Regions:
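Rhodanese-like catalytic fold shared by cysteine-dependent sulfurtransferases
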Residues: 2-16, 23-54, 63-94
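Short, surface-exposed ligand- or partner-binding patches at beta-edge/loop junctions that are enriched
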Residues: 58
Length: 94
């Protein structure tokens, strides 16, 4: 486990919030401003994400977002696991 990252600071500096849950899960609630690309489509749609900004991935509990971070880092993105979307939303928006 690396050093604790301040996700709020990263997001305030313009990071992209990537929600890798299914479109149905995303429709039921998500972090304001998040982009939804389900994990099983990330490889095909990764170019939709800007490479010049950090990406904070989230999902329901942190498992899928962890996989997404591995994919993103392998493609040269600066990526962070934001964990579950509801706790990330609380961290960012109070």
């Amino acid at each position: 486990m690396g050093p604790k990252v301040d996700l709020k600071e990263i997001c305030n500096k313009g990071a992209v919030i990537l929600d890798v849950r299914t479109t149905g899960e995303f429709a039921q609630g998500h972090v304001k401003g998040a982009i939804n690309i389900p994990l099983d489509r990330l490889q095909q749609q990764i170019k939709k994400l800007p490479k010049d900004k950090p990406v904070v991935a989230c999902c329901l509990s942190g498992g899928r977002s962890g996989s997404a971070v591995s994919i993103l880092k392998a493609e040269g993105y600066e990526a962070y696991n934001g964990g579950g979307w509801s706790s990330l939303d609380r961290e960012l928006n109070g």
